[in-house]
Protein backbone atom coordinates (compact mmCIF):
# COMPACT_ATOMS: atom_id res chain seq x y z
CA UNK A 1 0.00 0.00 0.00
CA UNK A 2 1.22 3.52 -0.79
CA UNK A 3 2.57 5.81 1.91
CA UNK A 4 -0.03 8.53 1.19
CA UNK A 5 -2.87 6.05 1.76
CA UNK A 6 -1.36 4.74 5.00
CA UNK A 7 -0.74 8.20 6.46
CA UNK A 8 -4.30 9.38 5.83
CA UNK A 9 -7.09 8.76 8.34
CA UNK A 10 -9.72 6.72 6.48
CA UNK A 11 -13.41 7.29 7.20
CA UNK A 12 -13.67 4.28 9.55
CA UNK A 13 -10.71 5.49 11.63
CA UNK A 14 -12.03 9.08 11.68
CA UNK A 15 -15.39 7.82 12.96
CA UNK A 16 -13.71 5.80 15.73
CA UNK A 17 -11.53 8.75 16.82
CA UNK A 18 -14.50 11.15 16.87
CA UNK A 19 -16.56 8.70 18.96
CA UNK A 20 -13.64 8.10 21.33
CA UNK A 21 -12.71 11.74 21.92
CA UNK A 22 -16.13 13.41 21.73
CA UNK A 23 -14.57 16.79 20.93
CA UNK A 24 -11.29 18.65 21.08
CA UNK A 25 -8.86 17.10 23.56
CA UNK A 26 -7.20 20.48 24.22
CA UNK A 27 -10.48 22.32 24.84
CA UNK A 28 -11.34 19.63 27.41
CA UNK A 29 -8.00 20.38 29.11
CA UNK A 30 -8.81 24.13 28.92
CA UNK A 31 -5.46 24.55 27.18
CA UNK A 32 -4.74 28.17 26.18
CA UNK A 33 -8.38 29.07 25.71
CA UNK A 34 -8.91 32.64 24.48
CA UNK A 35 -11.48 34.54 26.55
CA UNK A 36 -13.79 34.98 23.58
CA UNK A 37 -13.55 31.36 22.40
CA UNK A 38 -16.57 29.10 22.63
CA UNK A 39 -15.93 25.36 22.70
CA UNK A 40 -15.97 23.91 19.22
CA UNK A 41 -17.09 27.12 17.54
CA UNK A 42 -14.43 26.70 14.88
CA UNK A 43 -15.29 23.10 14.00
CA UNK A 44 -13.32 19.92 14.59
CA UNK A 45 -10.53 18.11 12.74
CA UNK A 46 -8.48 14.98 13.29
CA UNK A 47 -4.90 15.83 14.31
CA UNK A 48 -1.87 13.58 13.75
CA UNK A 49 0.53 13.17 16.69
CA UNK A 50 3.34 12.22 14.29
CA UNK A 51 2.64 14.42 11.24
CA UNK A 52 1.97 12.90 7.84
CA UNK A 53 5.01 14.78 6.53
CA UNK A 54 7.13 12.67 8.89
CA UNK A 55 5.40 9.42 7.95
CA UNK A 56 2.78 9.49 10.71
CA UNK A 57 0.22 6.75 10.11
CA UNK A 58 -3.52 7.32 9.87
CA UNK A 59 -4.32 5.06 12.83
CA UNK A 60 -6.27 5.65 16.03
CA UNK A 61 -3.12 5.60 18.16
CA UNK A 62 -1.73 8.55 16.15
CA UNK A 63 -4.78 10.78 16.12
CA UNK A 64 -7.12 12.84 18.22
CA UNK A 65 -9.89 15.35 17.70
CA UNK A 66 -8.88 18.98 17.79
CA UNK A 67 -10.83 22.14 17.11
CA UNK A 68 -9.46 24.25 14.28
CA UNK A 69 -8.05 26.75 16.81
CA UNK A 70 -6.04 24.13 18.73
CA UNK A 71 -5.02 22.21 15.60
CA UNK A 72 -3.59 25.43 14.17
CA UNK A 73 -1.89 26.20 17.50
CA UNK A 74 -0.34 22.71 17.49
CA UNK A 75 0.94 23.07 13.93
CA UNK A 76 1.84 26.77 13.87
CA UNK A 77 1.79 28.20 17.39
CA UNK A 78 4.82 29.96 18.77
CA UNK A 79 6.43 28.06 21.63
CA UNK A 80 3.41 25.78 22.13
CA UNK A 81 4.18 22.70 20.02
CA UNK A 82 6.44 20.93 22.53
CA UNK A 83 3.99 21.37 25.41
CA UNK A 84 1.01 20.40 23.26
CA UNK A 85 2.76 17.26 22.01
CA UNK A 86 3.51 16.27 25.61
CA UNK A 87 -0.18 16.65 26.50
CA UNK A 88 -1.21 14.84 23.31
CA UNK A 89 1.18 11.97 24.13
CA UNK A 90 -0.11 11.69 27.71
CA UNK A 91 -3.65 11.53 26.37
CA UNK A 92 -2.84 8.77 23.87
CA UNK A 93 -0.89 6.80 26.49
CA UNK A 94 -3.90 6.97 28.83
CA UNK A 95 -5.96 5.26 26.12
CA UNK A 96 -3.33 2.85 24.81
CA UNK A 97 -1.01 1.55 27.57
CA UNK A 98 1.28 -0.09 24.97
CA UNK A 99 1.51 3.19 22.99
CA UNK A 100 4.88 3.62 21.30
CA UNK A 101 5.80 6.53 19.04
CA UNK A 102 7.92 4.23 16.84
CA UNK A 103 4.80 2.22 15.93
CA UNK A 104 3.11 5.34 14.56
CA UNK A 105 5.48 5.83 11.64
CA UNK A 106 5.38 4.51 8.10
CA UNK A 107 7.87 1.82 7.15
CA UNK A 108 8.40 0.67 3.59
CA UNK A 109 6.44 -2.46 2.69
CA UNK A 110 3.82 -2.12 5.43
CA UNK A 111 0.07 -2.55 4.95
CA UNK A 112 -3.00 -1.55 6.93
Q: Where are the language model's segments positioned?
A:
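Short cysteine-rich loop/turn motifs with clustered Cys
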Residues: 8-45, 67-69
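Short Cys/His-rich Zn2+-coordinating modules
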Residues: 2-12, 46-53
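Catalytic metal-binding/acid-base residues of hydrolase active sites
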Residues: 30, 50, 73
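Polybasic, low-complexity binding patches
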Residues: 2-5, 53-64, 72-112
Amino acid sequence: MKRTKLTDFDSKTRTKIKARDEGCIFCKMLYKMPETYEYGMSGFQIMHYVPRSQGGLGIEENGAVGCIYHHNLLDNGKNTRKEMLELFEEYLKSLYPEWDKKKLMYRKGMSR
